[in-house]
């Protein structure tokens, strides 16, 4: 049985290098010959370690307090007069049993401590100058900026990490490569510098913090109205707890709120048209919003309205900057003139998915499969001057190839069947002397067309990266040597295999239930 590693959930081409994220690690390869270069590993967040330690200490203290209390009392309200203390009779036998149970609970909890693991990578992007890789580790809500090492191995090193107020779900980089634009699932879009600078709070900010200092808490009860020793202790603890000064929990780095949606954001793009910059955002409420670029991002230029279900992916072909292609939970791919907000065409994607599944599934199963677009990608064939659009859907072992015609229609030309569900796509550098290549990462852990059923342990395991070269206006599968990590990270056990669903398949969860509509 071969060793199984976590599949690659994100792929990006960075010049002559392939940047591939699997779990909480990023592998880098030479895209020309497939040679392995290095692996960057996400660190275990310190905040998670501290919170876990504090939680365990608190739990231990509570257990100790509960075990010490053998004669429970009724805690009196401060306004009530003293009442008789009623002691509950506890037999010797029952007391011994209780102690045994409590001791066994402690042993059980202490015998299986939770192991802290680094947060998986949920988003990945590259700056236009190819100098930096920006990754989002979702569990700790951190944006990490990585730079290339000036060594032969061309490894990545982290130069900054910034924890956002909410979990980022999509990233974009401005054309000057100086600003990161981050969208989170609570509908907010922030800008922050690519390379952070020390942020010194101003005197005005310090004054405002002093003005917001909380007043001292004065409980209505006092030592004159509380008589029992236990209630006096509770009163003192209440005073100490209530008089604690609340600490500032906001980010301590330079950042700015640009705009906000009232719904969960799903994707973001930065576009430039006629010398003016725009920010395009998509959300769960079927909206595509066109806003002006920084510093006027609060001004809404237009909306692209027409989707019935959520919008999950946006794509603007660099060769056709006025055109937007969007997809999500609808059966169709939409083509827009995004600045005018006008819908140019719709192309059915579900029919292609159903045609693929006909051989493997019954008609009822194929009909019940809903579209959840996970990727819309663009490539340019310089030989035929064709704009190529590639679309993938969640839980579908295929990639669907379209031509974007001069009349702004998407024409289906090919379906690439894959040995596993498609996860991410990227291209090698197009070279006029040789055809460019398409690289697709697949899920080789689950059965094709399924997001829950694991493959049999004795079944053959496909390569997590599939390669295709473009010849005569068609993609042809090719065998590519290399592209194999050499570290020991990412090897999966049975429990980790079951936990992959949440990382690899999260677009379909955006679909609203009947009671949400």
UniProtKB/Swiss-Prot annotation:
Any single biological process term in GO: tRNA modification
Subcellular location: Nucleus
Region Disordered, annotated ranges: 40-117
UniProt keyword Nucleus present: yes
WD repeat coordinates: 116-158, 260-301, 306-346
SUPFAM superfamilies from the UniProt entry: WD40 repeat-like
InterPro entries recorded: Trm82, WD40/YVTN_repeat-like_dom_sf, WD40_repeat_dom_sf
Entry GO CC: cytosol; nucleus; tRNA methyltransferase complex
HAMAP family: TRM82
Subunit structure: Forms a heterodimer with the catalytic subunit trm8.
Function: Required for the formation of N(7)-methylguanine at position 46 (m7G46) in tRNA. In the complex, it is required to stabilize and induce conformational changes of the catalytic subunit.
Entry-linked PANTHER family: TRNA (GUANINE-N(7)-)-METHYLTRANSFERASE NON-CATALYTIC SUBUNIT WDR4, WD40 REPEAT PROTEIN 4
Name this polypeptide is given: tRNA (guanine-N(7)-)-methyltransferase non-catalytic subunit trm82
Gene name of the record: trm82
């Amino acid at each position: 049985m071969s060793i199984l590693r976590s599949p690659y959930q994100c792929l990006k081409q960075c010049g002559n290098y392939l940047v591939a994220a699997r779990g909480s690690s990023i592998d880098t390869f030479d895209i020309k010959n497939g040679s392995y270069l290095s692996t960057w590993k996400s660190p275990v967040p310190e905040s998670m370690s501290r919170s876990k330690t504090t939680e365990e200490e608190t739990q231990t203290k509570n257990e100790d307090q509960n075990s010490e209390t053998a004669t429970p009392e009724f805690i009196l309200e401060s306004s009530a007069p003293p009442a008789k203390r009623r002691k509950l009779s506890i037999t010797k036998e029952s007391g011994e049993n209780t102690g045994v149970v409590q001791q066994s609970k402690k042993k059980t909890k202490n015998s299986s401590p939770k192991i802290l693991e680094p947060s998986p990578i949920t988003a990945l992007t590259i700056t236009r100058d190819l100098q930096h890789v920006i990754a989002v580790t979702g569990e700790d809500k951190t944006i990490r900026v990585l730079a290339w090492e000036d060594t032969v191995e061309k490894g990545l090193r982290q130069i900054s990490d910034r924890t956002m107020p909410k979990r980022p779900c999509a990233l974009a980089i401005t054309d000057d490569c100086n600003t990161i634009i981050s969208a989170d699932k609570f509908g907010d879009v922030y800008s922050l510098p690519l390379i952070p600078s020390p942020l010194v709070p101003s005197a005005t900010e310090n004054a405002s913090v002093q003005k917001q200092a909380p007043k001292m808490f004065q409980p209505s009860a006092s030592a004159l109205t509380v008589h029992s020793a236990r209630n006096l202790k509770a009163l003192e603890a209440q005073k100490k707890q209530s008089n604690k000064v609340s600490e500032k929990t906001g980010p301590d780095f330079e950042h700015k709120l640009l705009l906000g949606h009232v719904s969960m954001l799903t994707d973001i793009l930065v576009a430039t048209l006629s010398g003016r910059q725009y920010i395009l955002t998509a959300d769960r409420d079927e909206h595509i919003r066109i806003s002006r670029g920084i510093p006027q991002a609060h001004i809404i230029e237009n909306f692209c309205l027409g989707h019935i279900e959520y919008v999950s992916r946006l794509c603007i072909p660099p060769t056709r900057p006025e055109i937007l292609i969007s997809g999500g939970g609808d059966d169709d791919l939409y083509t827009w003139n995004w600045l005018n907000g006008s819908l140019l065409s719709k192309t059915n994607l579900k029919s292609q998915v159903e045609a693929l599944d006909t051989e493997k599934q019954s008609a009822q199963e194929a009909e019940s499969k809903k579209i959840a677009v996970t990727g819309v990608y663009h490539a340019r064939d310089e030989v035929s001057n064709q704009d190529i659009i590639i679309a993938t859907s969640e839980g579908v072992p295929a990639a669907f190839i379209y031509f974007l015609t001069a009349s702004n229609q998407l024409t289906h030309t090919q379906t690439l069947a894959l040995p596993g569900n498609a996860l991410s796509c990227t291209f090698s550098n197009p070279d006029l002397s040789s055809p460019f290549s398409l690289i697709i990462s697949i899920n080789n852990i689950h059965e094709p067309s399924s997001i829950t059923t694991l493959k049999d342990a004795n079944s053959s395991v496909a390569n997590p990266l599939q390669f295709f070269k473009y010849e005569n206006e068609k993609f042809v599968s090719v065998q590519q040597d290399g592209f194999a990590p050499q570290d020991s990270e990412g090897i999966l056990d049975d429990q980790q295999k079951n936990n992959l669903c949440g990382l690899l398949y999260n677009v379909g969860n955006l679909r609203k239930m009947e009671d949400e509509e």
